[in-house]
Amino acid sequence: MYEYFEGIIQAVTPAYIVIDVHGIGFRLLVANPYHFEAGEQKRVYVQLIIRDNDQTLYGFEGAADKRTFNQLLTVTGIGPKSALAILANVSSGGLATAIAQDDVKFLTKFPGIGKKTAAQIILDLKGKITTDGQPAAAAIAPVASDVDSELADALAALVALGYPQRTVDGLTDTLKAFSAKTTDAYLREGLRLLSGKA
């Protein structure tokens, strides 16, 4: 029904943004709200999901993420919230690489994704997830072998999110000193450091 909205970002919250299009404010659930800035002119790709009596608009920074979102919805066990949570943690290209490599362990890092659902994602979407119309070619970069598996997984996730390998490598010692117990804790700290919020 809608391909994209173009207008002024009026509000940014932890879960959604509001975009003003010719005086009408649309609330869009997005993967990473803080990638948007209030007051900026922005084109946001959208997908309307209608379920029962509920109509929800989902927003995306690019057409590739919108395509990936809709492809994820074709997988048994994946709903809009799960699809958005995946996109909040990995780029379309990173997801394509994980699927191409049958990386169940990587996929199970996403909220609500167990081994069974991860295997289903690989089965249903292998060779289908694309970036700008072409299968993603970038591999998930290997990380140093002298870090524990939780930290290594977090560093790989940061690269998959699109951060430069050199930048991520520069966080290794800082995150090692952080001594977190889980991949999620390392990932959150890495994102905090990369965002410049001390």
From Swiss-Prot:
Gene Ontology terms, cellular component aspect?
cytoplasm; Holliday junction helicase complex; Holliday junction resolvase complex
Q: What is known of its domains?
A: Has three domains with a flexible linker between the domains II and III and assumes an 'L' shape. Domain III is highly mobile and contacts RuvB.
Its annotated compartments are:
Cytoplasm
Output this protein's name: Holliday junction branch migration complex subunit RuvA
Its biological purpose is as follows: The RuvA-RuvB-RuvC complex processes Holliday junction (HJ) DNA during genetic recombination and DNA repair, while the RuvA-RuvB complex plays an important role in the rescue of blocked DNA replication forks via replication fork reversal (RFR). RuvA specifically binds to HJ cruciform DNA, conferring on it an open structure. The RuvB hexamer acts as an ATP-dependent pump, pulling dsDNA into and through the RuvAB complex. HJ branch migration allows RuvC to scan DNA until it finds its consensus sequence, where it cleaves and resolves the cruciform DNA.
- Indicate the quaternary assembly: Homotetramer. Forms an RuvA(8)-RuvB(12)-Holliday junction (HJ) complex. HJ DNA is sandwiched between 2 RuvA tetramers; dsDNA enters through RuvA and exits via RuvB. An RuvB hexamer assembles on each DNA strand where it exits the tetramer. Each RuvB hexamer is contacted by two RuvA subunits (via domain III) on 2 adjacent RuvB subunits; this complex drives branch migration. In the full resolvosome a probable DNA-RuvA(4)-RuvB(12)-RuvC(2) complex forms which resolves the HJ.
UniProt region (Domain III), positions on chain: 146-198
Q: What gene does this protein come from?
A: ruvA
Question: What keywords tag this UniProt record?
Answer: Cytoplasm, DNA damage, DNA recombination, DNA repair, DNA-binding
Q: Does the keyword Flavoprotein apply?
A: no
Tell me the GO BP annotations in alphabetical order.
DNA recombination; DNA repair
- Give the originating organism: Lacticaseibacillus paracasei (strain ATCC 334 / BCRC 17002 / CCUG 31169 / CIP 107868 / KCTC 3260 / NRRL B-441) (Lactobacillus paracasei)
Region of interest: Domain II: 62-140
* Residue ranges of the region described as Flexible linker: 141-145
Asked if the record carries the keyword DNA damage, the reply is yes
Against HAMAP family, the record matches this protein to: DNA_HJ_migration_RuvA (MF_00031)
